[in-house]
Structures are given as structure tokens and as C-alpha cells.
């Protein structure tokens, strides 16, 4: 899902960067009111786990890749704003040090994985979590990956409207990957709720 440099149009680059700056401002304003050593430790742990998982990539047609995201898990464990921050840190490190995702595409990558994946997973889990941890965790993980992948496809299509292939490919592949991520998210949340339920922010 990491979009490299040279793929997006200038309009998509600018619009996603503007959106990212707005979300980042709100996130830092919210986090400054609740930040603690406990939250810092959890954020660092989730960021490290997500970083490791995202480094396993499979290339797909259309100029991008397929990989685990971890957005739903980040949002559920940390809350949406700290979850966003953890994902943004991961994406910055990947782009600046490992060149995984381009700097010009950082806005788009962050909107997809740090905003859409985190917030959609968090909201859906909050709606379903009281009924079944497994159902809520699975559907949150699946939806977060599918929406992030589909939006990535939209950004690629807007940058090259001649071909709809990237949109279709990204949506279909991430619908499939979402099944695996949903299972991992559900398993992780079930384990955490059993061993240390107090650390979950939902």
C-alpha cells in the first residue's frame, strides 16, 4: 500500500498533504491533554510492532504493494489520536530511512493508513465491541484494510484516470488481505483483553 514517488499527480499530493497537516494538528492538540508515560510506552510498542509487520511487502500491479497495516489494532489499543500518531511515526521512519513509500506520497500514505485505517477500525470496534470481541476485532481489521486499500486505489486512479486497473486491483487484493488482518486483529485483541484489559482504550 506504500505509494512511491513519481506515481501521484500534483493535485493528489497537495490535497493529501493539506488533509494530513489538518489531522496532525488536531491529533497533537488532543494528545497533549492526555499524554502520559503509560501512553508513551504503549504507543512505542504498537509503533514497533506495526513497523515490523509493514516491512513485509508483496508488489501488486499499479505501482504499489500489499502488506499488513495494523491500523485497527493501533486505534483500538491506543485510541484514535495516539493510534494515528504511532502510524505516522512508522510511515515517517519508513519513508526517510528505508525509502518504503515516497516523501511526495507521504500525505497519501498517511491518510490511507494512519487516518482511514486507524479511525475506521476504532469506530467499528467501538460499535461492535460489546457484543463479541472476535466479531468486532475481525470486522474492524477487515474494514480498515479494505478502506485504506480502496482509497489508495482511488488516489492512483485520480493520478492516472486513463486506467481503472489500480483501483480494482487494490480494492480486490485488500479485501482478501483484510481476512488475514481481521483474524490477526481479533486474536491480538482477545489476548490483550484476557491478559491486560486495562490497556485497551476503547
Give residue spans per PLM region.
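Hydrophobic transmembrane alpha-helices
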Residues: 2-73
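Membrane-interface loop-to-helix entry segments
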Residues: 9-15, 107-115, 176-180
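Hydrophobic alpha-helical transmembrane segments
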Residues: 14-15, 40-45, 69, 84-88, ...
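Alpha-helical transmembrane segments of multipass membrane proteins
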Residues: 20, 50-53, 117, 121, ...
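Interfacial aromatic-anchored transmembrane helix boundaries in multi-pass membrane proteins
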Residues: 55-63, 89-120
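Alpha-helix C-terminal capping segments
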Residues: 73-82
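Short helix-perturbing small/polar motifs within transmembrane alpha-helices
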Residues: 111-152
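C-terminal transmembrane helix-loop-helix hairpin of multi-pass membrane proteins
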Residues: 135-145, 163-202
Amino acid at each position: 500500500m506504500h505509494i512511491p514517488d513519481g506515481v501521484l499527480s500534483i493535485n493528489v499530493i497537495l490535497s493529501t498533504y493539506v488533509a494530513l497537516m489538518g489531522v496532525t494538528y488536531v491529533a497533537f492538540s488532543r494528545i497533549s491533554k492526555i499524554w502520559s508515560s503509560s501512553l508513551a510506552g504503549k504507543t512505542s510498542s504498537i509503533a514497533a510492532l506495526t513497523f515490523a509487520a509493514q516491512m513485509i511487502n508483496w508488489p501488486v500491479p499499479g505501482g504499489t504493494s500489499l502488506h499488513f497495516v495494523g491500523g485497527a489494532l493501533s486505534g483500538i489499543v491506543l485510541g484514535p489520536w495516539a493510534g494515528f500518531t504511532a502510524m505516522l511515526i512508522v510511515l515517517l521512519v519508513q519513508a526517510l530511512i528505508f525509502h518504503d513509500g515516497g516523501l511526495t506520497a507521504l500525505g497519501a500514505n498517511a491518510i490511507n493508513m494512519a487516518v482511514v485505517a486507524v479511525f475506521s477500525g476504532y469506530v467499528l470496534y467501538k460499535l461492535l465491541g460489546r457484543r463479541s470481541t472476535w466479531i468486532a476485532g475481525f470486522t474492524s481489521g477487515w474494514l480498515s484494510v479494505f478502506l485504506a486499500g480502496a482509497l489508495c486505489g482511488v488516489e492512483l486512479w485520480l493520478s492516472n484516470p486513463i486506467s481503472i486497473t489500480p483501483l480494482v486491483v487494490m480494492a480486490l487484493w485488500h479485501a482478501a488481505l483484510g481476512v488475514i488482518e481481521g483474524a490477526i486483529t481479533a486474536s491480538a485483541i482477545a489476548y490483550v483483553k484476557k491478559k491486560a484489559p486495562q490497556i485497551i482504550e476503547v
